[in-house]
Amino acid sequence: MRRILNNFSTTIAMFVLAIPNGVSAQMNSAEAHAGPAMNYHRVDDRLATGGHFVDGGLADLHGQGVKVVIDLRDKPPSGQKEKLAKLGIEWINIPVVWKAPKQRDFDRFSRAMSKHQDDNVLVQCQANYRASAMTYLYRVVVEKVPEKDAKEDLRAVWEPNDLWQDYMNGIIETAP
């Protein structure tokens, strides 16, 4: 009987300890999916970053006046360009391989961003990691935003892993 009570007590204790983690995970999931795209983050009135679109996300983008989506996924969903075009939104795909970002990726991204510097732009990838990192780089290298300020927006989305931190450091160190 004592063993049964001990096992029962242990099970109850584990369940009670797991509840806050489950609630936190649900809140994080809800937070991650707020806005038109996963991990959506508005940098300013003309620039936002986000991951894949959530339900109703395309209509939300249109309602926010987004004119251009720069998609950094190396394998974007088919039909993305057509869906956005129906809403009057231009779609630009600059494939950036998650595990192997290159200098040329940043160069192409910078050209697209500079071309659309006066437009309302969403920079997108799968989870808003590539998008927020490339946006951070563009703001620091091209727009000359203080690194501390740009980093706040980057960290609102994620803390870059070693590969991406090294990539960003390399771009910044070699920038004119």
Name every feature range the model reports, one short phrase each.
Residues 9-22:
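Bacterial N-terminal signal peptides
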Residues 128:
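Substrate/cofactor-recognition hotspot
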